[in-house]
Amino acid sequence: MAGGSGARETRCRQGSRPGSPGSEVPAASVTGPRAEARPAGGGGGSRRAAPDRCSGGVPSAAWQHPFLNVFRHFRVDEWKRSSKEGDVAVVTDKVLKSAVYRIRGSVSASNYIQLPRTSTQSLGLTGRYLYVLFRPVPTKHFVIHLDVSTEDGQVIRVSFSNLFKEFKSSTTWLQFPFVFETKTPRRDLAGVALPRARWTCLQLDLRDILMFYLGRHYSHLKSIRLCASLLVRNLYTSDLCFDPAVTVTEARRAKLSVNPMPREMAFPVPKGESWHDNYIHVRFPSDCSKVPDEQDEKSCSPPEAVFLGRMSRHLPHPGVLGKPLLSSKSPVAQACSSALPCQVLSASSRLPEVSRTYRYREVSSVSASSIQSQRPSVRDEVPDAHTVSGERHVLADRSSGVPMALEDIGSCRLFLPDPVLRLKGVIGFGGHSTQWALWTKDGVAVVYPCHAVIIVLQIDTGQQRFFLGHTDKVSALALNGSDTLLASAQVQPPSMVRLWDFQTGSCLSLFRSPLHTICSLSFSGSGALLCGVGKDRHGRTVVVAWSTEQAGLGGEVVVLAKVHTDFDIRAFQVAFFDETRMASCGRGSVRLWRLRGGVLRSCAVDLGEYCSLELTDLAFAQALDGHCAPSAGTLFVCSHSGHILEIDHQRMSVQHVRRLLPARSPGAPLAEKQNFSVGSGIAISSLSVSTATCAVGSEDGYLRLWPLDFSSVLLEAEHDGPVSSVSFSPDGLRVLSTTTSGHLGFLDVPSREYTVLARSHMAPVLALSTEPNRGQMATVSLDHTVRIWDLATLQQLYDFSSSEDTPCAVAFHPTMPNFFCGFSSGAVRSFSLESSGVLVEHTRHRGAITSLVITLDGRFLFSSCSQGSLVQYSCADSQCCVLRVAANMVCQDGRPNPNILAVSGDSCRLAFVGPSKCMVTIVESASLDELLRVDVSTLNLASNHLDWAVAICFSPGNSGHLLVSTSSNKVVVLDAVSGHTLRELSSVRSRACCSLALSEDAHLLLAATDRTITVWDYPTQANPSCQVYIGHSEPVHAVAFTPDQLQVISVGDAIFLWDILATPERDGGDHEAPPGHEAGSSSGQLDDLASGASGLPRQQVPIPFQALPPPLSSHDRLLDGSTGTFSTSDEEGLCEENHVSEALLQGQAPTPHVLVDREASGAGDAPRETAGSSWTPAERPSPHSHMSEWSLRSGKAGLPTRPDSYKHFTPRYKTSPRVKSVYFPPIGRERLRLKAIVGYNGNGRANMVWRPDTGFFAYTCGRLVVVEDLHSGTQRHWLGHSQEISTLALNQDGQILASASCCGNTAARCQIRIWDVPKGLCRHLLSHHDTAVQALAFSPDDEFLVTLGDYADRNLALWSMATYELLSSTRLLEPVHGVAFNPWDANELICVGTNAITFWLLQHHGADTCFQVHREPIPEELGASELTSLCYGASPLLYCGSSSGQVCVWDTGTGHCFLAWEADDGEIGVLLCSGSRLISGSNTKRLRLWAVGVVPELRRKGSSARSSSVFMERELTLDGAVVSASFDSGMDMGVVGTTAGTIWYISWTEGTSTRLISGHRTKVNEVVFSPGESHCATCGEDGSVRVWSLASMELVIQFQVLNQSCLCLAWTPPSCELPEQQQVVAGYSDGTLRVFSISRTAMELKMHPHRTALTAIAFSTDGQTILSGDKDGLVAISHPCTGMTFRVLSDHRGAPISAIQSTSKEYGDLGVEGVELWLAASGDQRVSIWVSDWLRDRCELLEWLSFPAPAVSEAPGLLPPSLAAFCPWDKAILVCVGLGAHEEVIFYSLRQKQVIQKTPLPFFAMSLSLSPGSQLMVVGFAECMMRLLDCASGTAQDLEGHDDSVHLCRFTPSGRLLFTAAHNEILVWEVTDP
């Protein structure tokens, strides 16, 4: 037995004690406390075990064979060599009929059994397999911890628990979630053990777990801890793989190679039953063999499955593969084929198809290490070749009923050779830092990092060698003097350090440093000492020294010393002449270090007057012999101010100080020492010293060589960016330099020639394109560059950059030396490689370009943008011209994806994802006529989530296959003609494939999945094998084959070039099967899935629908409201630019005879003219007239383009017409009074104000201004606007509120209302803007109001608040995003927008007022072209937020920007500043608090200011983009509004956010009330059911169902009085019905009685029956207690059910028997009335009413629904409204069988409600109004308040309150007495 440090002998014992689980086995004692030693430094430590022997000298492994009973061996019942804690007891299990241990308790960590007794002991069990016989306690959690020792002495903890939600791994811990999941739709059982949890045999392959997940070799099992809650029978270890379901007789008869479970370990199986009918077998991670069993084919699928769920985090070695279970007794292979990605390990031989026993040769793991073929094989045999790559889960499932045939496994083919890809080259440098580049000892190679890869580049040959293994970017490098050891650290905290054998490339040691992050590493000359500098988790600087002496001999790296420091360290270096001495420098500090006696000590050098210098780098002087330095050792230190300090490290004193200044002329001498404050020195970032010269790199981009006396510059080389590091080669003849712009090269001093070694993109690469003739590749990146590379040399050929525009997509022309590039601005440019310039530019897109693709014949180019437009170009010649522009064709996705578009190999077809992300459309490439449209969401019927397309790719040639990558991590192969699914390939990663590429011979399929590359053996039909390759540290954005098909390219953080090792020749058996055969098999699978996914059988499999014939003309398509496509010809002389209006994009038909003129500022292909930066007077138009005829047209017919900024207000699209005349009741006689409004308009912008000093709080909802008292919750409502309100503004004294609404059909222009806050009255109405008002702002003295029009209006208007006159109005050249007055000067205001910031000065000439304008462009260094928000800080600071997430600070006195920092990942729409605090809110839902107190001090530094002093104090994530915010003067508390319709109270002091106002974001479909009127419930299109307190209208409970809409709702009737009986039933768009308990706040039942969407639902009067109607007209009757649907009525089939209502009746009333009366109304104007007695199963049709309706074309606008309701004051009277011959309400008597009354209405009714308390009826109309009818007196009153069609009216049960809804607005009205 493996145990202590030496061999120990013990006697073999036998014995048994009654009542103890287990049986007799040989036993050996546990090793004592001295069995292992822990090294200093913590962590897992080194735990090496020596062999142990039993008496008689038998090796330790022998006595454990064939298996070991762990409980018996360690006598668990005595608790001497084991321990227990908490509730642990021995009980008798009824199923096993034996004694078992029960471990239970609420806290797992406090209730457990542990073996051995103490952690200092070791079990020393060497068996490969551990068998855990246990049963989870129902509805509880459990945890199993295993401490496993590796051959190198490392202890790894392996844990399994159903508490874990995801897989987690580190170098010392593996956590596997053990998830119980049902195959039924109930999700509330997921996670905890099921109520019918079974005894489980958990079989763990400890050897494979360590090898697959950590790459380590298993030694022995050290300890076990079983934690609550579970029952455990026993534990066993063995080297044999047992199958519990196979008996000895079966194994012998079938000659199986598996071992039957020993009788002692077996569970009892009742006679006549199978093992799997009673128990569960879990094998993880592999199975030993495939055991076919014919009986298994007849078994049924069990209701539960136990598995470890799909994980999201990455393995340290994702390429190392795990294996799933393949036993026919537990056919997990079948489960993997549908739910989990199956994969085949590569091997040179095929799987045998006849033999039942499979054994294969040794195979290497497909990982980064296997690419170099440096890692030896990890196992002697591979029992099976089916694997799951990259997954971390355990499956335990009973027979599925669809067993996998033996031929299916045999048909899986293997890659030849293995691996199929080998990394050849990497284009890139840096990643985290660009300062690390090292020379090798011989000076022939350079070592540098590229993100997570370390590259060794041979200078002469250009050959690259790689060190792979890091999972994050490399932060530091160090190479010892003899080139034997290489050390590297990675960024991800806690920082991991790898120690490499530099010659072989193998990793000698991987250890966790005590540092949170490491920024510097330094070796001693011999390599025995490694020093590291970094930060701990608290931000303190730490220096660590490690001993690496034993690393090369298989030993460990030991921490020698560690010290915390308070001073800054920028550079740290171990002296080459004495490895116990070091030096460091930083801000104002140079320290000399010494390591003695395991302690690091340092002493500061007295710098005197230079103590405030910012020191950046240091270097020891070199001697001629390389052993000792001249002058007893000199240390050179450089500074950011240009000073060079020479320090004698022995005397610890400064010898010389020189300051380097830029030379006035070549060779001009510089002073040896100059005054500290004189001149501007060279900002030195790095230096390196040789025997006679010193190399200096500076931030001005120069590398300069100086003599050691620094008398003159010997040589200099200019770079394209600041130099970050310099380094002399060992011979001193070459100087290596790196720049912050990703440049790596060296200067050859003798020849004075500079050689470029590597260039790099400085941001993620988004897309690539290869040129077929010249071997070139183009890449585009977020660093605003387009680069052309030579694929043979990996060198950069061209570099095109744009400071204002980001390239997003690229495509080479197949025949001409041109390429096309799409940009974030929507421009598509054609570049010539011959002239290195732009040939033509097109700006037809409104959004960022997402994809570019060109046909293989070079005729057509296609581009798509984030707004969904598709543009077709003719590119047959160099002058590319636009052919067609189609709107709303492509999926609107803001992220660039090169695989959204795809062209077929014959250039005849174009495929794209669109018009929605669930659709894939194929059109003709020449005409864009639609050929096929496939709904991807119907391809995976078993999924509970909506599936959508991510990437597409045509198969090569004309094979007619289209490959679609879906969001469910699958690649679906479709027939491009019929749309049938031919096959599916499951991704081995947990994320979807964002890029696809298929080789020309259709043998290899590439997919980019997160940070990995997956390669499939595409011709294999069943379970195709695949391999996964790592190396990228960020997501891979695109993959492609080179034109010669010999290499693979992947781009993401860098550019990787892979060699394809597979030969293109394949045997004939690998060709694809005929499409027809595949389609047939696939359809069958879909049919099975369809019938299993829902409770009802499907009539047919959902198949892609064939598109309609192409329209006769594109003009007709536009008028139909369908996808807009139109053509232009450059030869016809028409306008080159054609925009699609907002109305067309929303499906509206355009107004006839609309003339589209090009805007004067250039919205088309021509360059835009921008205003200058000088002060110019702005044109002042007449206050009462428009500027010009063109200005008038631009607002209506100019079809402006909406900016790509969420700051701009866009009114919600409405189809409801406005009524021009409303009959309001006299004042004081209103029967309805508006009491409360539920919700906040998240569609507005800056539409919420709060004044902390007065407590005034106002916000908007629709066209109402809501003024709310935050203490009492009472509301006041200011009515007056006729359209949706866009923004609010409160003046400085808080007495005036301005509100602006957009224009509409009742208002030709926008309304701006001026409100008196104390009185709540409208003082004045202003009108000037044509479309919408973007922003309002009061001047500091409240004399002026400035109003800013939106992107379509573009007018800046100034108003006098004294006279309310328009003083000035200016037409802007481009949209402006924000405006603000200068708080210190009422005559100055500032606007922010595109490319510039604009200063406006008010000049008063008598009664006239005009503007003077000064435009200041945005500095190119910011890289931000859109400023979207602004606010003033301390004078004279102005803070501006950008669309790219930057905050820049301007000095308004000088008009210059002096500081900027990255404040967010998205667009910043809100900025607030007060004192030393700044708040930013963005569309990423984040609200951040910044400390900006140092900014005024930084202003004095000007352009040299750095943003590192600005830091974020707090951050909160809200539920939507931030659109409005108000805070107190101290910025401690405030209120914030989001696009989700929520207003939050923010407390920065507590770091909390509390909901103040909440509402539905989407349409409200129903409102219901509790019988006692204490609560109400609403449901919406977003799938939410919300329960509100009726007294306070505060949200109490919310039930959310994802990806479904909740369309109807009902509350249990008054007969259910008890609280536990209070339930809400909701109907959803997928046909499901869910019952929610209010008291338990949980879903109690889910039913699926309908195939289509539910449209109406109601309870019976006793609450024991649910009536539901659907879109097809079916009415289902169900029991909520049992979930059974016992009756379906189809009388209304063909028309949707619009209303269902039930009421009680006397048993014999109306001449029929029954206690309940209920009705159903349908959309075809029919109403059925039924009498029922559900307890007696009686339901009879009482009456059938059908009302005449006009033709559909006669009804204007939206069709009204058919509604009916029982009259509360006479239940025998029916009230009906709908689409009839007249607008009226019909009263029908069930007793008289006739219509007794008709009440005329002004319009067709959209909603109806009758009051139970009085004879009142409310009817809602599409005209945004409603009418209250008093049925007793016959009077009527009209009411307004809503902004859209009033589609919902509901009285409360008492009739005191009325709820009305229009879209997401809910208004609560109080009913008053007459």
Curated annotation (Swiss-Prot):
Q: Which Pfam families match?
A: Beta-prop_EML (PF23409), Beta-prop_WDR90_POC16_2nd (PF23393), CFA20_dom (PF05018), WDR90_beta-prop_4th (PF23342)
Q: Which GO terms describe its molecular function?
A: microtubule binding
Primary localization class, coarse: cytoplasm
Please give the positions of the paired cysteines in each disulfide bond: none
**GO terms for biological process, alphabetical:** centriole elongation; cilium assembly
Please list the residue ranges that the record marks as compositionally biased, kind Basic and acidic residues.
1066-1075
WD repeat start-end pairs? 469-512, 514-556, 563-603, 677-716, 718-757, 760-799, 844-883, 944-984, 988-1026, 1031-1068, 1280-1325, 1328-1369, 1371-1412, 1422-1460, 1462-1500, 1559-1598, 1601-1646, 1649-1688, 1695-1740, 1800-1839, 1841-1874
Q: One GO CC term of this entry?
A: centriolar satellite
InterPro entries xrefs: Beta-prop_EML_1st (IPR055439), Beta-prop_WDR90_POC16_2nd (IPR055441), CFA20_dom (IPR007714), WD40/YVTN_repeat-like_dom_sf (IPR015943), WD40_repeat_CS (IPR019775), WD40_repeat_dom_sf (IPR036322), WD40_rpt (IPR001680), WD_repeat_EMAP (IPR050630)
Query: What sections of the sequence does the record tag as coiled-coil?
Result: none
Using the record's annotations, give every residue carrying the modification Phosphoserine: 16, 20, 301
Which top-level group of life is the source organism from? Eukaryota
Per UniProt, subcellular location reads as: Cytoplasm, Cytoskeleton, Microtubule organizing center, Centrosome, Centriole; Cytoplasm, Cytoskeleton, Microtubule organizing center, Centrosome, Centriolar satellite
Spell out the residue ranges making up region: Binds with microtubules: 59-267
Per UniProt, the keywords (alphabetical) are: Cilium biogenesis/degradation, Cytoplasm, Cytoskeleton, Microtubule, Phosphoprotein, Repeat, WD repeat
**Function per UniProt:** Microtubule-binding protein that plays a crucial role in ensuring inner core protein localization within the centriole core, as well as in maintaining the microtubule wall integrity and the overall centriole roundness and stability. Required for efficient primary cilium formation.
Q: What is this protein's record name?
A: WD repeat-containing protein 90
Species this protein is from? Mus musculus
This protein's encoding gene: Wdr90
